[in-house]
Each structure stands twice: as structure tokens, then as C-alpha cells.
């Protein structure tokens, strides 16, 4: 059935964290007559109530599975990965509809073993509740247990974003792994750099112009070509000086040496 036909399909959002918050905002902002967010669940209900109040009238908030709407058309699991399958198993046999998870690292098969039809709607973005973003620019990656389920999820995705594509669970895992390297690890390294600066009386955000230029270059150059710095140049004198400076912090010294060696080896391979 097309999402554009008939009465609006009811959607229950399981979760009220960062991903669920932005997904809920996008669902409401789409103002679609095809699908309507009707209920939000979070354990205890506090986060669900806060999100439901933000999103407006007509959305109920519940804090226990006993209060859940059992006859909705959609159940979207926007919960931490380690909570996803345990929650699904609690709902097994109690609710029908199309079950969809938003995890990058969880296989579709894991959810499909609990319930069918099932699918995935994975938003490839970093989300924080307090930071607004344009969800229509967020790439969405879709998978379904069958062509009908996948088609419905694709159409839902197209209501929310301009960038929607099919992927397998294996491809999605690679995307998620790449995101951890590109986003999570790089953010951690920036946090390390900020702490280093503040400990030595320098402004925490002194590196922002450098970071902005680095990310801007990635829109036009492959990351390997955009690489700069002493390891890329083979500047052993500077590398040794930095390592001596970090001698009192062996973990940071090891991290610096490991990353420098990898940069140098990749540069030498061309």
C-alpha cells in the first residue's frame, strides 16, 4: 500500500534520545498526511513526555510497554544498540505492524528473527538533542525483509530526506564503521587537542579555523591528498620534539607515535 493512500498510518516511536528526537522532529515537520506520529515510548516516560510536549498536540507519551498502542502501523526502534533486541523480544507477539530500527551496526536479520515484516531506516549523521539540523539533508539508508516492507520504508524516508538509498546490512555496517573512524575518533582527537591547549593556557577553540579548513578541503579532495603535517612531510625532527613533549603522558605519546607512523606509511605507499 502506498503511504499516500487512505487514512494516515499511525507510527509509534520507541525511544526519546538523540536519534529519536531528531526523527520525531522530522516526522512532524514533514506534515505528511500519509503517516502520523501518534505515540512515543521511553522507559519511565520522562524523556518521552518531554519530546511529546515539544512536538505538539496529538502525540501521547508512555513509560511502560503495557501502555503501548498495540495496533499501530509502524514501530520505529530508535534506542541504543544494546537495548534494541531485548526491547523487540519484549514486544514479540504483542504488536504487529512494520518494525523498523535505526541502528547502523545491527543486522536486519537480528530484528527479523523476532518479527516480520521488519526493516531499517539508518540516518548517517551525528545527533545531539540540543543541536538543530536540517533532517532533509541527512542521508538515510534503507533495508527491508521483503520488497513491500522495503518500499514502504523508502517512501517514508523520502518524506523526510532528499537522500535515500538501499543498502545491505553488511554495507550499512561498513558505513557505520567508517562513521566511527571519521566522526567519533576525530572528535575524540579534537577533545584531546582542546585539553592540551587549555592545560597550557591557550584558548580551547584556537584550532577551530584549522578544523574548518580541514573539513572544507574534504569536499574537493580525497582525504589522503588533503593530509598535511610533520608525519606526511617526513619531518623527523619535529616528530621527535613532539614525542619528547608528551613523554610525561605515555598514552598520548603512544597515540601520537602510532598515528604518525600510519600517516607516514600511507604517504610512502602513495
Model-assigned labels for residue ranges:
Residues 11-13, 77, 142:
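Hydrophobic Val/Ile/Leu positions in short beta-strands of Rossmann-like dinucleotide-binding domains
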Residues 21, 25-29, 53, 89, ...:
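Short, well-ordered alpha-helices that flank and scaffold nucleotide-derived cofactor binding pockets
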Amino acid at each position: 500500500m502506498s503511504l499516500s493512500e487512505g487514512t494516515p498510518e499511525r507510527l509509534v516511536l520507541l525511544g526519546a534520545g538523540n536519534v529519536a528526537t531528531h526523527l520525531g522532529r522530522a516526522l512532524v515537520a514533514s506534515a505528511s498526511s500519509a503517516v502520523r506520529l501518534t505515540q512515543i515510548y521511553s522507559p519511565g516516560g520522562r524523556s518521552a513526555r518531554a519530546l511529546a510536549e515539544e512536538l505538539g498536540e496529538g502525540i501521547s507519551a508512555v513509560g511502560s510497554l503495557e501502555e503501548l498502542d498495540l495496533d499501530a502501523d509502524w514501530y520505529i526502534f530508535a534506542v541504543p544498540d544494546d537495548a534494541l533486541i531485548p526491547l523487540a523480544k519484549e514486544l514479540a507477539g504483542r504488536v504487529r505492524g512494520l518494525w523498523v530500527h535505526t541502528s547502523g551496526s545491527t543486522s536486519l536479520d537480528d530484528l527479523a528473527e523476532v518479527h516480520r515484516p521488519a526493516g531499517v531506516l539508518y540516518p548517517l549523521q551525528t545527533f545531539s538533542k540540543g543541536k538543530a539540523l536540517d533532517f532533509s539533508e541527512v542521508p538515510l539508508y534503507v533495508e527491508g525483509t521483503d520488497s513491500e516492507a522495503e518500499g514502504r520504508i523508502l517512501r517514508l524516508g523520502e518524506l523526510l530526506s532528499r537522500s535515500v538509498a538501499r543498502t545491505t546490512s553488511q554495507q550499512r555496517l561498513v558505513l557505520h564503521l567508517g562513521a566511527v573512524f571519521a566522526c567519533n575518533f576525530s572528535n575524540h582527537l579534537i577533545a584531546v587537542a582542546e585539553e592540551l591547549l587549555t592545560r597550557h593556557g591557550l584558548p580551547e577553540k584556537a584550532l577551530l579555523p584549522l578544523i574548518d579548513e580541514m573539513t572544507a578541503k574534504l569536499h574537493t579532495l580525497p582525504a589522503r591528498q588533503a593530509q598535511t603535517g610533520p608525519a606526511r612531510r617526513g619531518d623527523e625532527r619535529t616528530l621527535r620534539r613532539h614525542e619528547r613533549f608528551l613523554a610525561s603522558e605515555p598514552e598520548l605519546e603512544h597515540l601520537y607515535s602510532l598515528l604518525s607512523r600510519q600517516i607516514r606509511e600511507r604517504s610512502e605507499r602513495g
